[in-house]
């Protein structure tokens, strides 16, 4: 048993930056669509969560409801995962005093059309226990800020690792209060939101998110370190 334990320990290495590798979005479709094309008021603040519904837990949903209470012109755009989840989320919103028409459900569509609609989002809201992975990357590469809560286990730290990689630690919260405050600040301060979006549009900054050569080099170093031991 001690030999096996040592072997397992030898295979554990900290990956610098993030575990996730992406080849990036080459060309994000830009067709000048309006929010109203997707059932959203054109003058609204659009908050989105396109993560699968099983990632939404009671605590994070309550935070979303608190945010909607603080932002009267905000709407929550959620992936329409299945009918049961849709009904449950709608009922939960009502229990928190939020009108069901402020939850807009987005059907699954092909990737190009999804990236096209993603550009209409003001701020993306990450889930807590199980973060977005590709969902977070898609948002960031579409110049949409993602606010996350950094947890203590792997699946709850993915988005924070991606944000840290591109120098946006300011979007990482450590509890629900911070999470709500950061989202409300982004939505309330247009100059601040614009600054964050401009940073996400910076190719030099974003290149780190999909630098496959650098990722491969760092991964090879990890493997060499394992072999040495």
For each feature predicted by the language model, list its residue ranges:
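Short acidic loop-to-helix transition motifs that present clustered carboxylates
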Residues: 109-112, 132
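Conserved catalytic-core segment of nucleotide-activated headgroup transferases in glycan assembly
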Residues: 18-110, 117-119
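Short, conserved active-site loop motifs that form the nucleotide-linked donor/cofactor pocket
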Residues: 8, 102-103, 169-170
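Single conserved hydrophobic/aromatic residue that forms the stacking wall/gate
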Residues: 1-8, 12
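C-terminal amphipathic helix plus adjacent low-complexity
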Residues: 39-41, 51-53, 66, 79-81, ...
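Catalytic binding pocket for nucleotide-activated donors in carbohydrate/polymer assembly enzymes
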Residues: 118, 123, 127-209
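Hydrophobic/aromatic beta-strand patches that form the interior of the parallel beta-sheet core
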Residues: 13-16, 106, 123-125, 147
């Amino acid at each position: 048993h001690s030999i096996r334990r040592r072997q397992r320990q030898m295979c554990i290495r900290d990956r610098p930056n993030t575990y996730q590798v992406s080849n990036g979005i080459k060309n994000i479709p830009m067709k000048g669509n309006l929010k109203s094309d997707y059932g959203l008021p054109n003058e609204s603040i659009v908050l989105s969560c396109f993560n699968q519904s099983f990632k939404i837990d009671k605590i994070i949903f309550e935070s979303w409801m608190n945010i909607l209470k603080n932002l009267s012109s905000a709407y929550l755009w959620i992936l329409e995962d299945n009918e049961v989840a849709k009904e449950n989320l709608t009922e939960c919103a009502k229990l928190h005093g939020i009108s069901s028409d402020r939850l807009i459900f987005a059907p699954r569509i092909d990737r190009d059309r999804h990236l096209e609609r993603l550009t209409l989002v003001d701020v993306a809201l990450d889930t807590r226990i199980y973060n977005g992975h590709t969902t977070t990357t898609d948002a960031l590469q579409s110049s949409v800020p993602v606010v996350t809560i950094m947890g203590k286990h792997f699946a709850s730290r993915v988005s924070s690792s991606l944000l840290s990689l591109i120098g946006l630690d300011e979007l990482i919260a450590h509890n629900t209060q911070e999470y709500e405050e950061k989202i409300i600040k982004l939505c309330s301060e247009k100059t601040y939101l614009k600054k964050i979006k401009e940073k996400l549009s910076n190719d030099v900054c974003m290149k780190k998110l999909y630098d496959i050569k650098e990722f491969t080099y760092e991964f090879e170093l990890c493997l060499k370190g394992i072999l040495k031991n």
